[in-house]
Amino acid sequence: EFINRNGQFTVNLALMEDNVPSFGFVSTPIDQTLYWGGKHLGAWRLRDNTLEPLHTQACQTPMRVVASKSHLNQATRDFIANLGDTTLVQAGSSLKLLRIAEGEADVYPRLAPTCEWDTAAAQAVLEGAGGKVTQVDGSPMEYGKANILNPHFVASS
């Protein structure tokens, strides 16, 4: 997203404890917004000198599915089609996870490659807001592996 100069990039920092993101800090430099939080700490957003707590929302009808602006592959399209009545929310980079934390989306299926540094910080923020991120089989995300690529995953409120 940075290379494409579309303003949808983030700077991500995660504190890892036992290969689990316990705290995350995400910055969106273009709109000067900061997000931070952790599973047992809560989550917040600072924008325009206003500090707001973040909370996921109950799943809406139609379901609000957030997907990549630049990596919407056929597997993701098929996954979304199987959800039934949906509205597509597009965002780039780790902003997709943050849209769920802000209550602006319900689910984010990621069925294309990402790396650990793409998700760990925003996962901590999302979990602080009440959401979750799991591999598509429902098992927890794995970090600190020899292979830094993430498995396919689903984030949800």
Question: Over which residues does each language-model region extend?
Answer:
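Glycine-centered flexibility sites
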Residues: 7, 14, 24, 40-42, ...
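Acidic beta-strand-loop-alpha-helix segment within the catalytic core
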Residues: 12-98, 147-157
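Oxyanion/phosphate-interacting regions
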Residues: 77-82, 97-157
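Residue-level marker of alpha-helix boundaries and capping positions
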Residues: 2, 67, 87, 112-113
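Glycine/serine-rich anion-binding loops at beta->alpha junctions
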Residues: 1-10
